[in-house]
Structures are given as C-alpha cells and as structure tokens.
C-alpha cells in the first residue's frame, strides 16, 4: 500500500473479506501512507450464491467506506473445459476491474490469507504440475491495475476467531460448488501435514524462496545462472 492509493476491496460477504475491509478501513485512518478504500460486492446472477446486501452496505458504511454493488453473469457453456468455479472467479475478477476503474481505484485488495495461498500452491503442484500460487502483489498491466492480498501472512484460524468476536453474519446461501472443489480437499491435506509437523505451513511457505535447482531432476534454466 502506497501514498495516495485508492483501493477497491472485493467484499464477497465471507469472513475473510469482512475482516479485510475492517482492517484496511482502520489502517487508512493512520496518517502514513494516506490512502482511501471502497467496498464492492459482485452479484453473479446465474450462481445460487447470496449475501445479505443490506448487511454488507451497513457494515461498510459503519466503517466510513463507500459501498458499490455490481451485478453480472456468465454463460458456462461458452467454455466447457473450464469448471464453473474458474469461470465464476474469472468473471467476478473482471467485474472488480470494471468497478475499480469506475471508482478511480488503482488497486484491488482481495481477502486471501496464508491458508488460501498454501492450498493453491498444493493444488497447482498436484493438478497443474506447476510450482506457483497467488502472489501478495500482482501487477495486471493489461488492465492497468494492481491486485494486493494484505492478509497473506494471516492464518485462517485467526480470522475465524475475529469473525466470532465481531459476530460477522454468515452468507445467506453458500456457493453450490464449494464442497466439490479441489480447495476443500487441499484444506484437509494442509491439516494433515500440520498434524505430522506443526511447522509444516512455515516450511511450505519457506520452500517458495528456497528452490534448489541443482538438486532437482530438471534441466537448468540459463536465465537463472
């Protein structure tokens, strides 16, 4: 976060985005760096996923944050190779880009936490054969926008505790595909790894900065020399 940023917070209505909005709203009142916050909730009309918009608006207003609701939809038949989760996520992201531009924002803040990032790392390794995940800061030059994930070092357990303390309301309807995704499976994998080694999450996180190319069965990339 930098001086004079105007940040759009993707407010889904889940505990993570509610926590992120509160934390950024409170942080914006500190003198340096000076930045402003806008909350945006995207309604995907063709997905049976619903949040209490009155609650979200009142919550944002209680924090002194402007609130925007944007409705959109997508046709899953246009690309049957992609899962509904991927198509929904991508179209929500595009909607956030649109709202961000309309609101004069230069950054979009998403509520992903450390658990999300590690689960994505495990998913990409398992299903994509790629050592990659969601970066804390991603410059999207095509859209002239930067995505940030300010809670990248926060544990989901801490956010659950915050949600209980604040009394955050739960979704009216959860996503119908939520339990069918690989993410729910990887959440269990991460829990099992931590049962074997309580420091497993820190080891996984550290591995992203400790890639020993000469100890891997792959050809060395000359650009890394």
Protein language model features and the residues they cover:
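Generic structural signal for well-ordered, non-membrane alpha-helical segments
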Residues: 49, 89, 179-182, 197, ...
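A short, charged, Gly/Pro-tolerant segment at domain boundaries
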Residues: 199-225
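ATP-dependent adenylation/nucleotidyltransferase module used to activate substrates
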Residues: 1-122, 127, 157-165, 215
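Residue-level detector of flexible, active-site-proximal loop/helix-junction positions
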Residues: 44-46, 74-76, 138-141, 154, ...
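Catalytic subdomain that performs nucleotidyl-dependent activation
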Residues: 36, 107-108, 115-195
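Residue-level signal for alpha-helical context at structural boundaries
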Residues: 42, 74, 136, 181, ...
